[in-house]
From Swiss-Prot:
<dbReference type="GO" id="GO:0003949">
    <property type="term" value="F:1-(5-phosphoribosyl)-5-[(5-phosphoribosylamino)methylideneamino]imidazole-4-carboxamide isomerase activity"/>
</dbReference>
<keyword id="KW-0963">Cytoplasm</keyword>
<feature type="active site" description="Proton donor">
    <location>
        <position position="129"/>
    </location>
</feature>
<dbReference type="InterPro" id="IPR006063">
    <property type="entry name" value="HisA_bact_arch"/>
</dbReference>
<dbReference type="InterPro" id="IPR006062">
    <property type="entry name" value="His_biosynth"/>
</dbReference>
<dbReference type="Pfam" id="PF00977">
    <property type="entry name" value="His_biosynth"/>
</dbReference>
<dbReference type="InterPro" id="IPR013785">
    <property type="entry name" value="Aldolase_TIM"/>
</dbReference>
<dbReference type="InterPro" id="IPR023016">
    <property type="entry name" value="Isoase_HisA-like_bact"/>
</dbReference>
<comment type="pathway">
    <text>Amino-acid biosynthesis; L-histidine biosynthesis; L-histidine from 5-phospho-alpha-D-ribose 1-diphosphate: step 4/9.</text>
</comment>
<dbReference type="InterPro" id="IPR011060">
    <property type="entry name" value="RibuloseP-bd_barrel"/>
</dbReference>
<keyword id="KW-0413">Isomerase</keyword>
<comment type="similarity">
    <text>Belongs to the HisA/HisF family.</text>
</comment>
<dbReference type="GO" id="GO:0005737">
    <property type="term" value="C:cytoplasm"/>
</dbReference>
<keyword id="KW-0368">Histidine biosynthesis</keyword>
<dbReference type="GO" id="GO:0000105">
    <property type="term" value="P:L-histidine biosynthetic process"/>
</dbReference>
<protein>
    <recommendedName>
        <fullName>1-(5-phosphoribosyl)-5-[(5-phosphoribosylamino)methylideneamino] imidazole-4-carboxamide isomerase</fullName>
        <ecNumber>5.3.1.16</ecNumber>
    </recommendedName>
</protein>
<dbReference type="InterPro" id="IPR044524">
    <property type="entry name" value="Isoase_HisA-like"/>
</dbReference>
Amino acid sequence: MKIFPAIDIKDKKCVRLIKGDFNNKTEYEISPVDQAGKYKDHGFKNLHIVDLDGALTGETVNLDIIKEIVHKFDLKIEVGGGVRSIDSIEKYINAGVEKVILGSAAIKNKNFLKEACQKFPNKIALGLDAKDGYLSVSGWKENSNQLTLDFLKEVNDYGASRLIYTDINRDGTKESPNFEETTNVANVSNCPVIISGGVSSIDDIKKAKGLKNIEGIIVGKAIYDGDIKLEELVKELDA
């Protein structure tokens, strides 16, 4: 199973939000580039980056930082946060990003998702962020009134190569992921699923390994707060 240490960027800093609330954030001293280097030095191969400025503006605000990370470290990087145009996808792919995550824009406009998947085969990940079974959009500030599983069934054949499922009620809480709902999503999804939101311990990683159609798991706040040591986490990587 793949493990994706997370870097969320806001105002050029590493931050973590609680339940997606921009008013409830923790800033960390280490820079995004140095944090990526730390992950690389510990032996991680994958990295999950969210441009929180981009999530608010719809622009590739932190593209230069992401480019620097790509060029300095040999990591497979997935990037999300406010990607709302083919132009933005191209910028990230040209920068060397492995997969671009489409969230709100895909939920609001299914044709955009379909076009992106056709234009960039194997490069598009679908990011579904849900609260109480319903998808949220626009930096988690709006409820889309769309049931997660209903939406997934509609777009399942569009060609996304990865699905990142986040339970907003768990994100940043370290209360463990919503394994039950993630399992429901994985059972419906045509593509492999990444678990996100609430990882608190190595036990969560071990539990995720036993689930069907789960490709990997994203770990964020538990690393920054020292609840999970990178030395322990890297042992859970597939050989």
